[in-house]
Amino acid sequence: MTTETRSLFSQLPAIDRLLRDSAFLTLRETYGHTRVVDLLRQMVDEAREMIRATQALPAWCDNWACEADARLQKEAQSALRPVINLTGTVLHTNLGRALQAEEAVAAVSQAMRSPVTLEYDLDGAGRGHRDRALAELLCRITGAEDACIVNNNAAAVLLMLAATASGKEVVVSRGELVEIGGAFRIPDVMRQAGCALHEVGTTNRTHAKDYRQAVNENTALLMKVHTSNYSIEGFTKAVDEAELVSIGKELDIPVVTDLGSGSLVDLSQYGLPKEPMPQELIAAGVSLVSFSGDKLLGGPQAGIIVGKKEMIARLQSHPLKRALRADKMTLAALEATLRLYLHPEALSEKLPTLRLLTRQQEKIQVQGQRLLAPLLAHYGEEFAVAVMPCQSQIGSGSLPVDRLPSAALTFTPHDGRGSRLETLAARWRELPVPVIGRIYDGRLWLDLRCLEDETRFLEMLLK
């Protein structure tokens, strides 16, 4: 060991001495004695390794408490951190999809803080059913005879098939064999449910006769799958649910539909593209309809199945139902969200998903102009900052080809170097509340459609 190395080692403080410092007393109170001691040992080891490798002390050796505090704060951050979503995708799967209404947040908080009547019947003072209250709401909204709730729509499809068609064939149009994120494929789900897939038609055209010709003594279901995350256009033909129900009645075969995203209101009244609604399919005679809770419905992650009472009873009694059931927090949030649909006049204000989807481009443009001056003053030396029109998307596989006119704050490096955009985006991701945008066409875009808290946004970006 050289004299210089020995001298550097001698400058490393004893852990006991550091722990007596007032700053470390505060850290010990906040994070616990054991964790602080473990971290200091780790930091001393790191310093020793650096001395051996570089004959130098780490820069943070001038202020051990500050470095320890920074590390402990970062370590204590939740894995599920709040972010400001300015990607232009309203229902962003990677960012948690639908924001919950205040009523849903309050309901979840109450369910977490107190025992609740999850499976308790107050009238009979005995065991109740966890789906009952929500089933009544869903029947009221959709016109269905009964309903069943599980933890997501993939689970809903799995349960629907396993409980009604295991060991038998399910007839589906080839153009509806969808794959969603995470390689969830309808044919794979059918195999897991114990069903045999019977494809009919072609990718772009399926006729009523294709379904009729496919039915045999082993057919359990005729199935429709709404292609909510892609669109087939041009020379196309499909059989709608009403016609398929007519075929099913003729052949005594139930019809089921997986709607995917699923909307409980006619979106066209808000100037949005119309999506098929569960209540329309129930009215057409479909036996079971499944859809998501956390997409266009605007609630928590859940799989919802509505339909005929005898079919729902088969789902409720299947062993998979217990494995896939929703917990009390999900049910509390979903009930509160569904109750908002009983007051449709206030829905576009109270339901965050609908509120964000229906924001007008003109208002978003005004918001951008309001935010422009402080951002230009802060970033103007390196970037040209402007407000530009852009196109938002709904996301989560909903209405994939439709776009929503919006406005964005854009940042373009004066020197044209794309690396500056990557650096800026990375810096924003490291903020206490990360700001997430998107880079394309030589600019960093912050689509303002989902920005409601301007104060927090400016507080982050002007740091």
Swiss-Prot record:
CC cofactor: pyridoxal 5'-phosphate
Keyword terms of this UniProt record: Cytoplasm, Protein biosynthesis, Pyridoxal phosphate, Selenium, Transferase
GO MF term set: L-seryl-tRNA(Sec) selenium transferase activity
Pathway info: Aminoacyl-tRNA biosynthesis; selenocysteinyl-tRNA(Sec) biosynthesis; selenocysteinyl-tRNA(Sec) from L-seryl-tRNA(Sec) (bacterial route): step 1/1
Record GO cellular component, one term: cytoplasm
Record PTM N6-(pyridoxal phosphate)lysine, positions in chain: 295
Main location, first listed in the record: cytoplasm
EC number: 2.9.1.1
Subcellular localization, as worded in the UniProt entry: Cytoplasm
GO biological process terms on file: conversion of seryl-tRNAsec to selenocys-tRNAsec; selenocysteine incorporation
Enzyme class: transferase
Reaction it catalyzes: L-seryl-tRNA(Sec) + selenophosphate + H(+) = L-selenocysteinyl-tRNA(Sec) + phosphate
Self-association and partners: Homodecamer; pentamer of dimers. Binds only one seryl-tRNA(Sec) per dimer.
Family to which the UniProt record says this protein belongs: Belongs to the SelA family.
Free-text function comment from the UniProt entry: Converts seryl-tRNA(Sec) to selenocysteinyl-tRNA(Sec) required for selenoprotein biosynthesis.
Name of this chain's protein: L-seryl-tRNA(Sec) selenium transferase
Organism whose genome encodes this protein: Escherichia fergusonii (strain ATCC 35469 / DSM 13698 / CCUG 18766 / IAM 14443 / JCM 21226 / LMG 7866 / NBRC 102419 / NCTC 12128 / CDC 0568-73)
Recorded name of the encoding gene: selA
